[in-house]
């Protein structure tokens, strides 16, 4: 039985738990635990998951994999300790790795601990192509994020713009992924994931657009290299519980987790 600990007790955590506990066959395959702020989270968790409030207790539980499903802060707070203990660490808040010192430190701890850092593709696809294209000198990668105003309420309010008054697309940001991931830690983990797969945080160009006509959370990726060109457009439905996050993200994490333990990896 594989032991998986999840950091965070919010929407993504609950979705992961429900998926991995959906059938008796899955419950026989996975033993699950959650690191939460309280033994009784505000939203109840499935009864088959153990709940801890201390990372040392989680590691004493001897997980095979720790899944961060909380925030960039959780990556900084818990990543090093898990990797030093020899436990592989799956990072959903990939924007934390825009901190190059943190990224280098976590990588060194993973190497020393004989374990791995895993970054799921999250809301996008095509990372296998991007990894190959990035091996060609001069490869270029550009990413455009388009989300409806509901995904950017605090940002619009800070600009003095009423979300209901947005009638035309607004460019919130244009620049490197390194800056985008830090400026928008809850919305642009995709940019950091692309950068890790491709040409790096500084070279990956990002444009962030608030679009009242967007049918969902839209991700547009353009890649150009000596091997050819590649364009991908994805329109994801927002999570019913969190419009900042695409609905597909949690299931992608589940798929990545299952692949980690599978004898056949795609």
Where are these regions (language model features)?
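Rossmann-fold NAD(P)-binding glycine/threonine-rich loop
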Residues: 94-115
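Beta-loop-alpha module in the N-terminal Rossmann-like domain of NAD(P)-dependent dehydrogenases
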Residues: 55-57, 61-84, 96-100
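Hydrophobic/small residue at the entry helix of a nucleotide-binding pocket
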Residues: 12
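NAD(P)-binding Rossmann-fold cofactor-contacting core
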Residues: 25-45
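A short, Lys/Arg-enriched amphipathic alpha-helix followed by its capping loop at the start of a domain
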Residues: 15, 19-29
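Extreme N-terminal starter segment of soluble prokaryotic enzymes
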Residues: 1-5
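Active-site-lining helix/loop region of Rossmann-like oxidoreductase modules
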Residues: 7, 15, 118, 123-266
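A short hydrophobic/small-residue beta-strand
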Residues: 88-90
């Amino acid at each position: 039985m594989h032991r998986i600990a999840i950091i965070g007790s919010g929407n993504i955590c609950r979705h992961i738990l429900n998926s991995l506990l959906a059938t008796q066959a899955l419950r026989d395959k996975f033993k699950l635990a959650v690191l939460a702020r309280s033994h009784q989270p505000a939203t109840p968790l499935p009864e088959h998951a153990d709940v801890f409030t201390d990372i040392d207790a989680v590691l004493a539980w001897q997980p095979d994999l720790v899944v961060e499903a909380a925030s960039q802060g959780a990556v900084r707070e818990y990543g090093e300790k898990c990797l030093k203990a020899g436990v592989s660490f799956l990072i959903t808040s990939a924007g934390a790795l825009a901190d190059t010192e943190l990224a280098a430190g976590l990588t060194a701890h993973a190497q020393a601990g004989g374990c791995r850092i895993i970054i799921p593709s999250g809301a996008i696809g095509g990372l296998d192509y991007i990894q190959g294209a990035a091996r060609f000198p001069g490869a270029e990668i550009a990413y455009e994020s388009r989300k409806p105003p509901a995904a950017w309420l605090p940002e619009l309010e800070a600009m003095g713009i009423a979300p209901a008054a947005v009638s035309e697309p607004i460019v919130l940001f244009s620049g490197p992924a390194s800056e985008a991931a830090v400026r928008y830690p809850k919305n642009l983990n995709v940019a950091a994931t692309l950068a890790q797969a491709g040409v790096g945080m500084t070279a990956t160009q990002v444009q962030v657009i608030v679009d009242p006509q967007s049918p969902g959370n839209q991700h547009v990726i353009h890649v150009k290299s000596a091997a050819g060109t590649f364009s991908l457009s994805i329109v994801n439905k927002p999570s019913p519980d969190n419009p900042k996050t695409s609905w597909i993200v949690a299931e992608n994490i589940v798929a990545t987790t299952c692949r980690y333990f599978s004898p056949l990896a795609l």
